Swiss-Prot record:
Designated name of the protein: Large ribosomal subunit protein uL5
N-terminal signal peptide: none
Entry's Gene Ontology molecular function annotations: rRNA binding; structural constituent of ribosome; tRNA binding
Organism name: Synechococcus sp. (strain RCC307)
Taxonomic superkingdom: Bacteria
GO biological process, one term: translation
Length: 179
């Protein structure tokens, strides 16, 4: 059963009861997932930018947008308009497919994985996690990568607070660390 179908048929009714909501539309849901990779070396190395665009597209199934510097910063040797990263926003079916792969395939492949931190909520029910290596995703072949690079994954929900957001992600199968 896909995550989207499981959310509609099992998770939504359970959260409605657990969080004492009177209306189904009050139940928190995932709005979007943002995958971002900052590339400091992209200013000097164009190949790293191309490799990152390809990797993020392979992982998410959607072509990422190249983010550019808004201002020149001499200390970082970047000028305005230089590429400094890649980002992609997933919604709908692609979002649910990505979340399912992240929770069930990618996170368990992290070395010494004991669960994700419960402290990474932002106060409004949104969750951000940093991934140190892109090779945890099964779509990325170890032979084809030129360097190990991480990424930030933000899960935006309609939850009003962290407790609701955590309840939603826990029901979806997010492996939280037992403190």
């Amino acid at each position: 059963m896909s995550l989207k179908k499981r959310y509609r048929e099992a998770i939504q009714p359970k959260l409605l009861k657990d969080l004492n909501f009177s209306n189904l539309h009050q139940v928190p849901k995932v709005v979007k997932v943002t995958v971002n990779r900052g590339l400091g070396e992209a200013a000097q190395n164009a190949k790293s930018l191309e490799a990152s665009v390809e990797e993020i597209a392979t992982i998410t199934g959607q072509k990422p947008v190249v983010t550019r510097a808004k201002k020149a910063i001499a200390g970082f040797k970047i000028r305005q308009g230089m590429p400094i990263g890649v980002a992609v926003t997933l919604r709908g079916d692609r979002m649910y497919a990505f979340l399912e792969r992240l929770i069930n395939l990618a996170l368990p492949r992290i070395r010494d994985f004991r669960g994700v931190s419960e402290k990474s909520f932002d106060g409004r029910g949104n969750y951000t996690l940093g991934v140190r290596e892109q090779i945890i995703f099964p779509e990325i072949s170890f032979d084809k990568i030129d360097a190990i690079r991480g990424m930030d994954i933000t899960i935006v929900t309609t939850a009003r607070n962290d407790e609701e957001g955590q309840a939603l992600l826990r029901e979806m199968g997010m492996p939280f660390r037992n403190n």
